[in-house]
């Protein structure tokens, strides 16, 4: 059984995909819902029970037209319910067999998901000669100028990396990475810039992470997903905020033969397992990064933005970094330097669907984006 929470805006398409009678589709769509879930591979008995229980609380469970004939052992469906209806349905399912108790627990995690935090900008600073976006590449002098400008603009999160993680990039020697960082780290520590903003180190090397944390960085952004025991030990010693990003393989080969049986189910398992590991190391201040563009195709990236609220069930802030990435180019046909509009479109929808942190290259435009977004949120 696989459960994926859908954006309510996707209800019409989800109903058409399942294929109930047209008159039933129209009736279900008119109910006006707070929660929509796509439930896959549900046993027949559970399907029939869930249908009746959902209707009994005022919701509905859309099933394929031939489900009533009970020809198949498993069925997919779309669950539609308001928050109140879902609360009552969870109680009913909790005492039922055929896997419905597990379903109730899964639904409850979504019902209890917290509202997103006030959105924040995480500015990207790359001390690399090969970052995919040329204007984000800085030497130490230019990088320091940029940091001071960002601080004047009120930026409170700054992510600094000295090794490219773009697709097909090679893993570099940590000594090269650390040499690129040295001057920046000294300035941040000596001038106490860490009192003005939180600095994040973007690295997959434990020794580089330790070096940055010793210089008062307070966020560890490990793009390998905390795969190494060494990185976990460093995190345990310094207790930074940890950014846990979903990916597969390494930057060099992550876009080769990308395949998921079910993207959301596999990401759920990934985050659950990794969060358990981090908890064992007494690390609880965690931000989840969906890994937009990391081991994902265009359709994966777009689905993650559209149904981002699915991951709110983990009760962690969600980070999205779609800034100028290839998916935008595939849609618009534009090169990286001309992808600002596409970036803003994706990031606005990410905020609407639960993102708390946007990792961005274009600071001024995103400051304006968040101002407008917050104004809309506050408007009656």
Curated annotation (Swiss-Prot):
Sequence segments annotated as region (Dihydropteroate synthase): 105-380
Keyword Repressor: no
Binding-site residues, Mg(2+): 126
Pterin-binding domain boundaries: 119-371
Note on cofactor: Binds 1 FAD or 1 FMN per subunit.
One GO molecular-function entry: metal ion binding
UniProt pathway annotation: Cofactor biosynthesis; tetrahydrofolate biosynthesis; 7,8-dihydrofolate from 2-amino-4-hydroxy-6-hydroxymethyl-7,8-dihydropteridine diphosphate and 4-aminobenzoate: step 1/2
UniProtKB keywords: FAD, Flavoprotein, FMN, Folate biosynthesis, Magnesium, Metal-binding, Multifunctional enzyme, NAD, Oxidoreductase, Transferase
Annotated catalysed reactions: (7,8-dihydropterin-6-yl)methyl diphosphate + 4-aminobenzoate = 7,8-dihydropteroate + diphosphate; (6S)-5,6,7,8-tetrahydropteroate + NAD(+) = 7,8-dihydropteroate + NADH + H(+)
Cofactor(s), by name: FAD; FMN; Mg(2+)
Effect of residue 31 to A: Unable to bind FMN
UniProt xrefs under InterPro entries: DHP_synth-like, DHP_synth_dom, Dihydropteroate_synth-like_sf, Dihydropteroate_synthase_prd, Pterin-binding_dom
One GO cellular component term noted in the UniProt record for this chain: cytosol
Annotated SUPFAM superfamilies: Dihydropteroate synthetase-like
Impact noted for substituting residue 92 to E: Unable to bind FMN
PANTHER family attached to this UniProt entry: FOLATE SYNTHESIS PROTEINS (PTHR20941), FOLIC ACID SYNTHESIS PROTEIN FOL1 (PTHR20941:SF1)
Domain-level remarks: The N-terminal extension of FolP is essential for the reducing activity and binds FMN.
Protein name: Bifunctional dihydropteroate synthase/dihydropteroate reductase
């Amino acid at each position: 059984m696989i459960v994926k929470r859908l954006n309510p805006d996707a209800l019409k398409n989800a109903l058409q995909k399942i294929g109930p009678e047209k008159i039933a589709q129209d009736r279900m769509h008119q109910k006006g819902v707070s929660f929509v879930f796509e439930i896959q591979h549900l046993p027949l008995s559970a399907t029939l029970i869930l249908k009746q229980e959902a209707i009994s609380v005022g919701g509905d469970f859309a099933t394929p037209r031939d489900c009533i004939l009970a020809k198949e052992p498993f069925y997919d469906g779309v669950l539609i319910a308001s928050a109140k209806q879902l609360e009552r349905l969870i109680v009913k399912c909790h005492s039922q067999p055929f896997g419905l108790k597990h379903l109730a627990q899964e639904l409850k995690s979504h019902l209890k998901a917290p509202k997103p935090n006030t959105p924040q900008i995480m500015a990207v600073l790359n001390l690399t000669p090969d970052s995919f976006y040329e204007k984000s590449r800085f030497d130490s002098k230019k990088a320091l100028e940029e940091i001071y400008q960002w601080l004047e603009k009120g930026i409170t999160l700054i992510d600094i990396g000295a090794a490219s993680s773009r697709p097909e990039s090679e893993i570099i020697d940590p000594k090269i990475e650390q040499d690129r960082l040295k001057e920046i780290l000294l300035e941040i520590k000596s001038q106490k810039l860490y009192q003005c903003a939180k600095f994040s180190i973007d690295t997959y090397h434990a020794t580089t992470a330790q070096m940055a944390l010793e210089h008062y960085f307070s966020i560890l952004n490990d793009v390998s997903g905390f795969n190494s025991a060494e990185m976990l030990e460093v995190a345990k010693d310094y207790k930074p905020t940890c950014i846990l990003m979903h990916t597969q393989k390494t930057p060099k080969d992550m876009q080769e033969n990308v395949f998921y049986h079910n993207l959301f189910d596999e990401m759920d398992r990934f985050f659950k397992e990794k969060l358990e590991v981090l908890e064992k190391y007494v690390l609880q201040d965690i931000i989840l990064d969906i890994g937009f563009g990391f081991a994902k195709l265009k359709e994966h990236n777009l689905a993650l933005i559209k149904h981002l609220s699915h991951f709110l069930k983990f009760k962690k802030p969600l980070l999205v970094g779609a800034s100028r990435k290839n998916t935008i180019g595939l849609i618009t046909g534009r090169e990286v330097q001309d992808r600002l509009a596409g970036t803003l479109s994706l990031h606005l929808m990410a905020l609407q669907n639960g993102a708390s942190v946007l990792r961005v290259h274009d600071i001024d435009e995103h400051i304006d984006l968040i101002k407008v977004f917050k104004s809309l949120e506050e408007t009656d």
